Curated annotation (Swiss-Prot):
<feature type="topological domain" description="Cytoplasmic">
    <location>
        <begin position="90"/>
        <end position="101"/>
    </location>
</feature>
<keyword id="KW-0762">Sugar transport</keyword>
<feature type="topological domain" description="Cytoplasmic">
    <location>
        <begin position="346"/>
        <end position="359"/>
    </location>
</feature>
<feature type="topological domain" description="Extracellular">
    <location>
        <begin position="55"/>
        <end position="68"/>
    </location>
</feature>
<dbReference type="InterPro" id="IPR036259">
    <property type="entry name" value="MFS_trans_sf"/>
</dbReference>
<protein>
    <recommendedName>
        <fullName>Sucrose transport protein SUC8</fullName>
    </recommendedName>
</protein>
<feature type="transmembrane region" description="Helical">
    <location>
        <begin position="278"/>
        <end position="298"/>
    </location>
</feature>
<keyword id="KW-0769">Symport</keyword>
<dbReference type="GO" id="GO:0015293">
    <property type="term" value="F:symporter activity"/>
</dbReference>
<comment type="similarity">
    <text>Belongs to the glycoside-pentoside-hexuronide (GPH) cation symporter transporter (TC 2.A.2.4) family.</text>
</comment>
<keyword id="KW-1003">Cell membrane</keyword>
<feature type="topological domain" description="Cytoplasmic">
    <location>
        <begin position="491"/>
        <end position="492"/>
    </location>
</feature>
<feature type="transmembrane region" description="Helical">
    <location>
        <begin position="325"/>
        <end position="345"/>
    </location>
</feature>
<feature type="transmembrane region" description="Helical">
    <location>
        <begin position="102"/>
        <end position="122"/>
    </location>
</feature>
<feature type="topological domain" description="Cytoplasmic">
    <location>
        <begin position="161"/>
        <end position="181"/>
    </location>
</feature>
<keyword id="KW-0813">Transport</keyword>
<feature type="topological domain" description="Cytoplasmic">
    <location>
        <begin position="425"/>
        <end position="444"/>
    </location>
</feature>
Length: 492
């Protein structure tokens, strides 16, 4: 998120790295770690495009607004299944190319395939019989959904082995490990900013004029162009890293039993011995993600639909309004990423001043709740302005600034959400008798399961209240407020 998958790879990282530290004679030079970490920029570029542009694209293809969240189920499902599985098998990979490089290369190639399917879904669908004037382009939707799921699986195939490769290169050196992961986070921020900047540029398709076709309008052509840049960046940094950095072939030791316990078997076993502090952490984390997930999926759609008053299924003027809002929303996400990066650098100092991690988490959840609730005010102001100035009127500078301010402010609680829960899980694990990897694995379930619940639940809620994004944001605000209270009162 950006991002959503950065959290889902924690489980695989701990497990993969721990079994490979002895395979290298010593830590590798920092320049090699930076080369591997740079792959994160390519990965996150694609994730930024997913979060900012793909939900509106789904609706342009004709998927009803209330059902589009089901397509996003791939994120939590693949985070729950793919990353741990990839970690499990990469630990045991005996390829002459090394443990991690085969999975990283496979993930990059799958991303390329997925990008072609997603970007050309409308064209493929049209060539297979979809009518341009029909609101639902079923063949294009099927092709898009296939490409979308492949993209999520591919990104998950990349994330875990990349972080595990950094652990291998650090070879047990704690300082090098922290430095390598810091660079990985840095390149994630770089990818986010690049992705959101590309998504906010409305004339990108002019660089690739062939992207605009009879079945693919300007918005669709811009999406294609963004993904072409994304896959180019990813392939370049991946090829450089895999060529430059050696990944030694692994052979199991003769005296090793090479245990076959499934990864999830170990995670579920941790529930039997889990103590109260960990349960409280899981509750706060789950509530936190119930709050976050609707906004992370529908933030740019909210900007295009509620703030700008556009409609992805309306006439050309309404579509133009909607597209303008989407691109301003992408700018908001770029501001969000910048704030997130800045705040992340100061979390430790802020935590000390405010009185500890749980107080900091509780405080920023209040910010999250207020910001989500304020989307209602911004929406009502935009609707009032359109009633006075006309339905095609653009939002005033004040309304637009208010919406962008919410995007930026939400970078503060997002930075805490990406760090504090995992730090608390590590602290709790040291006194509970559970290993850090198991604790983080259980915490990961408290992230992806709420995402699935939200994916199934927000559609009916929206339909019950007449459609739009505000009902899900209000539910998120309530969940954030409850999460704040629980964090202040029951966290250790």
């Amino acid at each position: 998120m950006s991002d959503l998958q950065a959290k889902n790879d924690v489980v695989a990282v701990d497990r993969q790295s721990s079994s490979s530290l002895a395979d290298l004679d010593g830590p590798s030079p920092l320049r090699k770690m930076i080369s591997v970490a740079s792959i994160a920029a390519g990965i996150q570029f694609g994730w930024a495009l997913q979060l900012s542009l793909l939900t509106p694209y789904v609706q342009l293809l004709g998927v009803p607004h209330k059902w589009s969240s089901f397509i996003w189920l791939c994120g939590p499902v693949s985070g729950l299944l793919v990353q741990p599985s990839v970690g499990y098998f990469s630990d045991r990979c005996t390829s002459r190319f090394g443990r991690r490089r085969p999975f990283i290369a496979t993930g990059a190639l799958l991303v390329a395939v997925a990008v072609v399917l997603i970007g050309y879904a409308a064209d493929f669908g049209h060539s297979m019989g979809d009518k341009i004037d029909k609101p639902v382009k079923m063949r294009a939707v099927v092709i898009f959904a296939l490409g979308f799921w492949i993209l999520d699986v591919a990104n998950n195939t990349l994330q875990g082995p990349c972080r595990a490769f950094l652990g291998d290169l650090a070879a047990g050196d704690a300082k090098k490990t922290r430095t390598a992961n810091a660079f990985f986070s840095f390149f994630m921020a770089v990818g986010n900013v690049l992705g959101y900047a590309a998504g906010s540029y409305t004339n990108l398709y002019k660089i690739f004029p062939f992207t605009m076709t009879k079945a693919c309008d300007i918005y669709c052509a811009n999406l294609k162009s963004c993904f072409f840049l994304s896959i180019t960046l990813l392939l370049v940094v991946t090829i450089i890293a895999l060529w430059y950095v050696e990944d030694k072939q692994w052979s199991p030791k003769a005296d090793s039993d090479n245990e076959k316990t499934p990864f999830f078997g170990e995670i579920f076993g941790a529930f039997k011995v889990m103590k109260r502090p960990m349960w409280m952490l899981l509750i706060v984390t789950a509530l936190n993600w119930i709050a976050w997930f609707p906004f992370l999926l529908y933030d740019t759609d909210w900007m295009g639909r509620e703030v700008y008053g556009g409609d992805s299924k309306g006439d050309d003027k309404m579509k133009k309004l909607y597209n303008q809002g989407i691109h301003v929303g992408a700018l908001g996400l770029m501001l969000n990423s910048i704030v997130l990066g800045i705040v992340s650098l100061g979390i430790e100092g802020i935590s000390k001043k405010i009185g500890g991690a749980k107080r900091l988490w509780g405080a920023v959840n209040i910010i999250l709740a207020v910001c989500l609730a304020m989307t209602v005010l911004v929406t009502k102001k935009a609707e009032e302005h359109r009633r006075i100035a006309g339905p095609m009127a653009l939002p005033t500078d004040g309304i637009r600034a208010g919406a962008l301010t919410l995007f930026a402010l939400l970078g503060i609680p997002l930075a805490i959400t990406f760090s504090i829960p995992f730090a608390l899980a590590s602290i709790i694990s040291s006194s509970s008798g559970a290993g850090q990897g198991l604790s983080l694995g259980v915490l990961n379930m408290a992230i992806v399961i709420p995402q699935m619940i939200v994916s199934f639940g927000v559609g009916p809620i929206d339909a019950l209240f007449g459609g739009g994004n505000l009902p899900r944001f209000v539910v998120g605000a309530i969940a954030a407020a409850i999460s704040s209270v629980v964090a202040f009162t029951v966290l250790p």
